[in-house]
Amino acid sequence: MTTPQRNQSARAFGRALKAARLERGLRQEDLAERGDFDRTCPSMLEHGRRSPSFFVILQLARALRMKAVVLFAEAVAQLRKEGRP
């Protein structure tokens, strides 16, 4: 995967994460607390400045009280909306 593709994937995941967080009425600070993250982590992920590891995706899903596969699928849907496979 090239750097532009990696960046686009990180941004798509960030949009999916933000949508899931907002659907639950959570602030970034709430998500950080629930997931035991540094307070800057949700912001960095939502803006595509950081790519999540598998473990972080699991923690995020748990904090959002959703299945990790659903969160991941939402990120893939974001990529497809942009015309990326």
For the regions a protein language model found, what residue spans apply to each?
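Recognition helix of helix-turn-helix/homeodomain-like DNA-binding domains
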Residues: 36-51
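Short, charged recognition helix plus adjacent turn
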Residues: 2, 62, 70-85
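A short, Lys/Arg-rich alpha-helix, primarily the initiator
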Residues: 1-23, 69
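Short basic helix-loop element that most often maps to the first helix and adjoining turn
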Residues: 15-34, 59
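Conserved hydrophobic/aromatic packing and binding residues within compact polymer-binding modules
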Residues: 17, 31-32, 42-45, 71
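Active-site phosphate/pyrophosphate-handling residues
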Residues: 30, 40, 55
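Short, basic-rich loop-to-helix N-cap that marks the start of a DNA-contacting helix
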Residues: 49-61
